[in-house]
Structures are given as C-alpha cells and as structure tokens.
Amino acid sequence: MARVTVEDAVEQIGNRFDMILVAARRARQIAVQGKDPMVEEENDKPTVIALREIELGLVTADTLDADERQTVREREAAEIAAVAAIAEGRNNVI
C-alpha cells in the first residue's frame, strides 16, 4: 500500500480546507452512497481512496458537483415516472 500524503492532494485542489471538503464528500459517496472507487481499493478506507483519487486528479469539487446534479436529475425523473404511473392507474380505474 502506497502512502498518501495530504500535500499531493492539496496541490490538485488548491488549499487544505477545500481539499478536506472534497475528500469528505467523495469518501461519503464511496462509504454511504455505494459509489465505485475510481482507483484500486487496495484494502484502504474510503478517506484514503478519496485522497488517492484527488491526488491523481480524478476527483475535484466540479466533478463532485456534476455527479450530484446528475443523481438529483435521475431521482427526480424516477419520482416523475412514479407519479405518472399512479396518475395513469387512477385514470384507468375511473
């Protein structure tokens, strides 16, 4: 397992504070939301995986924002489809 240094990730993001926010968001995606890592897991924890992804330039605040917008769009589309199916079912009953 290669050691990840925070300095390598900071260089990609710009400053420590933004890097911490990006790493936390990405680690949460991996750990809680079930998103697939973009690098080999190598038995690392989600925070280390997130730092390695940032270090390689695979994850930025912009990519996380775009991913979250896509997730919201997909969720909204599913909700609209569900409401349409319910409405159609009611129309068939009447």
From Swiss-Prot:
Nucleotidyltransferase found in the keyword field: yes
Enzyme Commission (EC) number: 2.7.7.6
An annotated GO cellular component: DNA-directed RNA polymerase complex
GO molecular function, a single term: DNA-directed RNA polymerase activity
Subunit structure: The RNAP catalytic core consists of 2 alpha, 1 beta, 1 beta' and 1 omega subunit. When a sigma factor is associated with the core the holoenzyme is formed, which can initiate transcription.
Function description: Promotes RNA polymerase assembly. Latches the N- and C-terminal regions of the beta' subunit thereby facilitating its interaction with the beta and alpha subunits.
NCBIfam families: rpoZ (TIGR00690)
Protein name (record): DNA-directed RNA polymerase subunit omega
Source species: Shewanella woodyi (strain ATCC 51908 / MS32)
